[in-house]
């Protein structure tokens, strides 16, 4: 971005004007086009979503109307069909009512009923499978479980017709049976498929358990799965976006209050963008026309600016070559005309300036020659004085530096001795502390050894106890096996007794009951014995594990005893070495203190000598510095005079390049 801006700044005014005008044209129109496109997308999204919701509501009303009408008829049948109507002599009347109802309702596939005894009546008649039992059907069970309520089943394939239906059922008022109606869902499928949302969008209906009632490309009764299905059943109504087979889609849905079915409308998201793309195409056409018209206007505007600028540039080039007699012809009173007039004034001012510079150069050249000669004489005299002072100063400085070096070395030695004394004192104290800590460590190691011996005895005792538990657990297992054998034998005897009692007939019935109870108790005893045996087996396993752990602990304790003894011997050796070090340190402290006292006396004498030497050296250096400053000043004056003379010559040559008179 920075490189692009630099390139634009370095380009011509015409190019910058073209870029500026194009930006003024393109940016607003492009922004408007994008805004219009986004507004169109948002508006179409709202419209299509609203259309989907309206279609869902229409389909919901259709379902509610069909179900409500059927429920009202079913309520009539449940009030009318009492237990008396289920009897054989009344079945003809029941079938006649069913027949009339079917003739009046095309969407009904069958009407049927069943009493509590399973007596099934249906119109129209159909051959039912030999194992058919109405009492085992879902519609019968749900209706009997929801007394006074109408239930709607999941879509299923009718046994008689082989077509997909939903059953609407209700228990009779007197509770003697159930009356049900098989409603065709073909017309619902047709209605749902006839609803179009956008170009490729469609509506569909799912049951409460995610099974298809009406869905394009899916068979009724098929259970649907997927993340979008879970979202659909998360709320009662709403809309959401999802991806289906790699394409983005949008869905609006609602839940039927009557049946609990999910009624949904779905559409492809790209339809919205396809419809809105027309707006983008029109905006692009407008942008192209605007750029064409704008470029034509820009050409004439730029030409009116660049032509006068070229004349000014040509005149400026002549002036840059030294021709100050050049003037610009003024043809306008705009900003370019004002610039041309200012340019002419500038050329006139430059001519006057060059005349004045030529006169001043001659005067400066003669003055600089006189100043150079005077500065040379003064500089030579100052150099002689400076050389004499420097020789004396160098000797004094050398002496002072040697004294300072000696003093610093003595001070450093003194500081080192003091530090050595402090370190020796600290080491002595540390040695004493080490001796005390070593004694305490030896005592603690002895206590630890005693504790480790106690732990060793405890572990060995625990190992013996665990081994005893293992033996007793095996004895319990043997006893349980004996009990289990007794229970099996008792069970066999009880069975034999029951057989003998059965042979005895009526007289042996009481004994048979007792034998059965004895057999049950034997079975329970055997089961309990097996459970106890299983628990004992687990306990034996745990005992084995504990025994292994105790043996491992015993080995670790023995190892710990050996290491404790080694640690005790190490502490004794440390204590002996510490006492020896403390004795040697006390002797060293006395020697260091004597050296430190002597070094302090030498350091004090060196400091006095250094102070006197510095005072003498400082005075000589001040004189030398003043002389050097004067010499430097004279050299600068001489150099400046030479420079001024050279510059006046150069300035004289430069003014000769300008043409100030025609």
Curated annotation (Swiss-Prot):
Ranges where the Methyl-accepting transducer domain occurs: 374-610
Keywords in alphabetical order: Cell membrane, Chemotaxis, Membrane, Methylation, Transducer, Transmembrane, Transmembrane helix
GO process terms (BP): chemotaxis; signal transduction
Localization annotation: Cell membrane
Cytoplasmic side: 1-16, 303-662
Record's GO cellular component terms: plasma membrane
Modified sites of kind Glutamate methyl ester (Glu): 370, 594, 629, 636
Residue ranges of coiled coil: none
KW Membrane (keyword) present: yes
UniProt membrane topology term: Multi-pass membrane protein
Extracellular compartment spans: 38-281
Record bears the keyword Ribosomal protein: no
InterPro entries tied to this protein: dCache_1 (IPR033479), HAMP_dom (IPR003660), MCPsignal_dom (IPR004089), Sensor-like_sf (IPR029151), Tar_rcpt_lig-bd (IPR003122)
PROSITE patterns: CHEMOTAXIS_TRANSDUC_2, HAMP
Domain HAMP stretches: 303-355
TM annotation in the entry: 17-37, 282-302
Domain Cache: 152-228
Subunit structure: Interacts with YabA.
Family in the record: Belongs to the methyl-accepting chemotaxis (MCP) protein family.
PANTHER family xref list: METHYL-ACCEPTING CHEMOTAXIS PROTEIN MCPB (PTHR32089:SF114)
Function, in words: Chemotactic-signal transducers respond to changes in the concentration of attractants and repellents in the environment, transduce a signal from the outside to the inside of the cell, and facilitate sensory adaptation through the variation of the level of methylation. All amino acids serve as attractants in B.subtilis, they appear to cause an increase in the turnover methyl groups, leading to methylation of an unidentified acceptor, while repellents have been shown to cause a decrease in methyl group turnover. The methyl groups are added by a methyltransferase and removed by a methylesterase.
Protein's UniProt name: Methyl-accepting chemotaxis protein TlpA
Organism: Bacillus subtilis (strain 168)
Upper classification of the organism: Bacteria, Bacillati, Bacillota, Bacilli, Bacillales
Name of the gene this protein is made from: tlpA
């Amino acid at each position: 971005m920075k490189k692009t801006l630099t390139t634009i700044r370095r380009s011509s005014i015409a190019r910058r004007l073209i870029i500026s005008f194009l930006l003024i044209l393109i940016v607003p129109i492009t922004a408007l086009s994008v805004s219009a496109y986004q507004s169109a997308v948002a508006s179409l999204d709202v419209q299509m979503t609203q259309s989907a919701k309206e279609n869902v509501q229409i389909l919901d009303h259709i379902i509610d109307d069909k179900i409500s009408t059927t429920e009202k008829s079913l309520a009539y049948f449940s009030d009318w069909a009492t237990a008396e109507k289920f009897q054989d002599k009344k079945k003809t009347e029941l079938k006649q009512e069913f027949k009339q109802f079917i003739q009046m309702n095309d969407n009904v596939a069958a009407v049927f009923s069943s009493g509590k005894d399973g007596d099934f009546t249906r119109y129209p008649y159909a051959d039912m499978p030999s194992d058919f039992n109405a009492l085992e059907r879902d519609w019968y069970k749900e209706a009997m479980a929801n007394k006074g309520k109408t239930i709607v089943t999941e879509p299923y394939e009718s046994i008689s017709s082989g077509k997909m239906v939903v059953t609407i059922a209700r228990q009779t008022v007197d509770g003697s049976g159930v009356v049900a109606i098989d409603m065709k869902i073909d017309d619902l499928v047709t209605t749902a498929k006839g609803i179009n949302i956008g170009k490729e969008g469609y509506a569909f209906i799912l049951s409460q358990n995610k099974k298809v009632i009406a869905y394009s490309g899916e068979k009724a009764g098929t259970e649907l799965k997927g993340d979008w299905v879970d979202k659909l059943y998360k709320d009662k109504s709403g809309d959401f976006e999802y991806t289906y087979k790699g394409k983005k889609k949008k869905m609006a849905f609602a839940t039927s209050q009557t049946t609990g079915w999910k009624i949904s409308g779905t559409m492809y998201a790209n339809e919205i963008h396809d419809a809105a793309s027309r707006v983008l195409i029109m905006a692009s056409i407008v942008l192209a026309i605007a750029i064409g018209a704008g470029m034509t206007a820009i050409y004439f505007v730029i030409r009116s600016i660049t032509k006068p600028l070229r004349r000014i540039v040509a005149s400026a080039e002549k002036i840059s070559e030294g021709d100050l007699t050049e003037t610009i012809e003024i043809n306008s009173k705009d900003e370019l005309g004002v610039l041309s007039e200012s340019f002419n004034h500038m050329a006139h001012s430059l001519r006057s300036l060059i005349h004045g510079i030529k006169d001043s150069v001659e005067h400066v050249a003669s003055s600089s020659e006189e100043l150079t000669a005077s500065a040379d004489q003064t500089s030579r005299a100052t150099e002689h004085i400076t050389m004499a002072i420097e020789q004396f100063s160098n000797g004094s400085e050398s002496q002072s530096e040697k004294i300072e070096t000696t003093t610093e070395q003595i001070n450093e030695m003194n500081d080192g001795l003091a530090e050595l004394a402090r370190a020796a004192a600290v080491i002595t104290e540390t040695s004493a502390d080490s001796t005390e800590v070593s004694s305490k460590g030896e005592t603690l190691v002895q206590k630890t050894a005693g504790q480790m011996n106690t732990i060793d005895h405890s572990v060995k005792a625990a190992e013996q106890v665990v081994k005893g538990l293992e033996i007793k657990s095996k004895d319990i297992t043997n006893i349980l096996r004996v009990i289990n054998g007794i229970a099996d034998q008792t069970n066999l005897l009880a069975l034999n007794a029951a057989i003998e009692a059965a042979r005895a007939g009526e007289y042996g019935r009481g004994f048979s009951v007792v034998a059965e109870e004895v057999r049950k108790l034997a079975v329970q005893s055997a089961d309990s014995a097996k459970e106890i045996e299983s628990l004992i087996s687990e306990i034996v396993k745990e005992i084995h594990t504990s025994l292994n752990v105790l043996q491992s602990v015993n080995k670790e304790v023995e190892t710990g005893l050996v290491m404790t003894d080694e640690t005790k011997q190490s502490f004794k050796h440390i204590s002996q070495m510490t006492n020896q070090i403390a004795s040697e340190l006390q002797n060293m402290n006395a020697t260091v203190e004597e050296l430190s006292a002597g070094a302090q006396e030498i350091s004090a004498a060196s400091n006095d000598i250094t102070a006197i030497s510095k005072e003498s050296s400082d005075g000589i250096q001040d004189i030398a510095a003043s002389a050097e400053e004067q010499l430097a000043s004279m050299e600068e004056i001489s150099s400046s005079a030479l420079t001024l003379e050279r510059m006046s010559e150069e300035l004289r040559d430069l003014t000769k390049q300008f043409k100030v008179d025609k």
